[in-house]
Amino acid sequence: MTSEKYRFFLKKIEELYNKLHGVEARAKVVEVKDDGTVVVEFTGTFCHTCGVRDWLEDFAYLAVARGVEARLVEMIEPEGEEIDYKRIGVFKFNFESSQIESGDLGGDE
């Protein structure tokens, strides 16, 4: 996949995540690095539930279900007032090993 396809794929995963998680959790891809590291900002009331890490891991699971290796490598809890409704997820994506085609990027769960 080209860099443009990576970003398109991540945008589709972001949109699907937000559709599935509604108002409780919202994801926004904020950084994509050449080595496959992807930084995603998560906001919402999910931060007050148990299993906070699971909410972040769902982002990776949506990618895996579409043929791209992905895993959460770090969850960052911001300090200060933002901590109540925000978490940062650092993911590792392996786009190079995927066999995904452009037509496979969309789709609802």
Residue ranges and their predicted role:
Residues 1-109:
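Domain-level signature for proteins that mediate thiol-based redox and metal-cofactor handling
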